């Protein structure tokens, strides 16, 4: 009962964290609900970029691929390689999920550095990358948790839960807490890195507005891509782990 209570408290804490506000926010009132408009607007922009890129990629495929087609094929192969390395031979059905996570996070992170969100004025707050908001990163982490529970249950059925008493039943509380803390580590790692990167750039621009921030911005682009890769790789690793049934 203590383990179950602790797990429920962890989930409740994660839900509360998803409501944390950093700075001012702009909301839409829809019925009896307040909708976080800043995150929705920037997320829609990112989704539009991804859908537009996908349309360009599949619009007119050539037998002899063009440079653009080569680029998109390379991205697909890269995502497939990451999925296969972490999940194993049954990686196929999970490539779309891992690819969606990677591309959404990658474009979101880069949008914070490349798109001039700040020039768009809002009644309250300001626009920023979707992954600059804890609500987005918690949602992505919870989706990952649902995915690896589904992967384990779909392959092993209720026998999936036997992993919690391996290699010894003494580790039951630790194994349960491990699964419930994975979303916390995923969400806070991504949120903290993106928020810190944008804050550093803003501070440097305010102090030395011309030359100094440029190298930091390039470093931010690099770390943003690395964070997207880390998130997608860990998500694939968790899914592969749940299907294999060992740690």
From Swiss-Prot:
InterPro entries given in the database record: ATP_syn_F0_a_bact/chloroplast, ATP_synth_F0_asu, ATP_synth_F0_asu_AS, F0_ATP_A_sf
Keyword field contains Thylakoid: yes
GO cellular component terms attached to this protein's record: chloroplast thylakoid membrane; plasma membrane; proton-transporting ATP synthase complex
Keywords from the named record: ATP synthesis, CF(0), Chloroplast, Hydrogen ion transport, Ion transport, Membrane, Plastid, Thylakoid, Transmembrane, Transmembrane helix, Transport
Nuclease found in the keyword field: no
Location within or outside the cell: Plastid, Chloroplast thylakoid membrane
MF terms (GO), sorted A to Z: proton-transporting ATP synthase activity, rotational mechanism
Top-rank lineage group of the source organism: Eukaryota
TM segment ranges: 38-58, 95-115, 134-154, 199-219, 220-240
Membrane topology (UniProt): Multi-pass membrane protein
Function in brief: Key component of the proton channel; it plays a direct role in the translocation of protons across the membrane.
Quaternary data: F-type ATPases have 2 components, CF(1) - the catalytic core - and CF(0) - the membrane proton channel. CF(1) has five subunits: alpha(3), beta(3), gamma(1), delta(1), epsilon(1). CF(0) has four main subunits: a, b, b' and c.
Family statement: Belongs to the ATPase A chain family.
Protein name: ATP synthase subunit a, chloroplastic
Lineage: Eukaryota, Viridiplantae, Streptophyta, Embryophyta, Tracheophyta
């Amino acid at each position: 009962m203590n383990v179950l209570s602790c797990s429920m408290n962890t989930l409740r804490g994660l839900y509360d964290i998803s409501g944390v506000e950093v700075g001012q926010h702009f909301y839409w009132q829809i019925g009896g609900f307040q909708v976080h408009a800043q995150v929705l607007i920037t997320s829609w922009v990112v989704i539009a970029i991804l859908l537009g890129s996908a349309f360009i990629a599949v619009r007119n495929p050539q037998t002899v691929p063009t440079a653009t087609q080569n680029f998109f094929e390379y991205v697909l192969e890269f995502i497939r390689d990451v999925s296969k390395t972490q999940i194993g031979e049954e990686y196929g059905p999970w490539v779309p999920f891992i690819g969606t996570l990677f591309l959404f996070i990658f474009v979101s992170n880069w949008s914070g550095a490349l798109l001039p969100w700040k020039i768009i004025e809002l009644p309250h707050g300001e626009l920023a990358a979707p992954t600059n908001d804890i609500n987005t990163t918690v949602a992505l982490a919870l989706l990952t948790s649902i995915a690896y529970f589904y992967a384990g249950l779909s392959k092993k059925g209720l026998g999936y839960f036997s992993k919690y008493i391996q290699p010894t039943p003494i580790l039951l509380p630790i194994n349960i807490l491990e699964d419930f803390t994975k979303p916390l580590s995923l969400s806070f790692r991504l949120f903290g890195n993106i928020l810190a990167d944008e804050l550093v750039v803003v501070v440097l621009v305010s102090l030395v507005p011309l030359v100094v921030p440029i190298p930091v911005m390039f470093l931010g682009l690099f770390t943003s891509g690395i964070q997207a890769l880390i998130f997608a790789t860990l998500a694939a690793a968790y899914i592969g782990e749940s299907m294999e049934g060992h740690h």
